[in-house]
């Protein structure tokens, strides 16, 4: 849900993800199809983290994955102040809810993004939020949000394997010619 907008917008999309393994899986999958993605987390050596920061500052990344704890560090926010952030994607957004089983205080601190980066779009995603949790997510993280709620049964989803050539062009053509009215 956030990868397509990230690729269509100039700058780097910052993806807030709660788990290192999830970040690694996402970045590996994106690298495999030619998307420039990286993560900053405690699994990196200082040299690896420095290389990712250099890639970020030079504009070579499309997506950067970070945990909420790292994102809320003043050094990380200062780093992001120096780049063109295209959007913030808050994955597993149900973690913002004090009522949820996965509550993490730093998710609640992401409210800062609204005031520090008011011009940067935000998207919050979760598959496990009841109505009360969704209201809390919108109240803390988003402004005038549109909510999309669907069941797990998705008959509109199907798989097709396509050789990769120019990923951005293929993606734009797919949207333009196969989903222009969606």
Which role fits each region the language model picked out?
Residues 1-7, 23, 106:
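Motif I (Walker A/P-loop) of helicase-class P-loop NTPases
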Residues 11-14, 36, 60-64, 84-87, ...:
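Loop/turn-to-beta-strand initiation segments
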Residues 13-23, 178-182:
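Conserved strand-helix element at the start of the C-terminal RecA-like helicase core
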Residues 24-58, 139-141:
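Conserved helix-turn-beta segment of the N-terminal RecA-like "Helicase ATP-binding" lobe
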């Amino acid at each position: 849900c956030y990868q397509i907008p990230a690729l269509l917008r100039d700058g780097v999309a910052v993806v807030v993800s709660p788990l290192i393994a999830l970040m690694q899986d996402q970045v590996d999958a994106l690298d495999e199809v030619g998307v420039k993605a990286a993560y900053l987390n405690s699994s990196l050596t200082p040299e690896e983290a420095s290389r990712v920061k250099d890639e970020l500052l030079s504009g070579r990344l499309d997506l950067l994955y970070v945990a909420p704890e790292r994102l809320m560090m003043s050094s990380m926010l200062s780093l992001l102040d120096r780049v063109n952030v295209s959007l913030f994607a808050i994955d597993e957004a149900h973690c913002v809810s004090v009522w949820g089983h996965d509550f993490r205080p730093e998710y609640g601190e992401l409210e800062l993004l609204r005031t520090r980066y008011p011009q940067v779009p935000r998207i919050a995603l979760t598959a496990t939020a009841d109505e009360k949790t969704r209201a809390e997510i919108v109240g803390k993280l988003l402004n005038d949000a549109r909510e999309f709620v669907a069941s797990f049964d998705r008959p509109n989803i199907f798989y097709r394997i396509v050789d990769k050539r120019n990923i951005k062009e293929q993606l734009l053509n797919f949207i333009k010619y196969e989903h222009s009215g969606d």
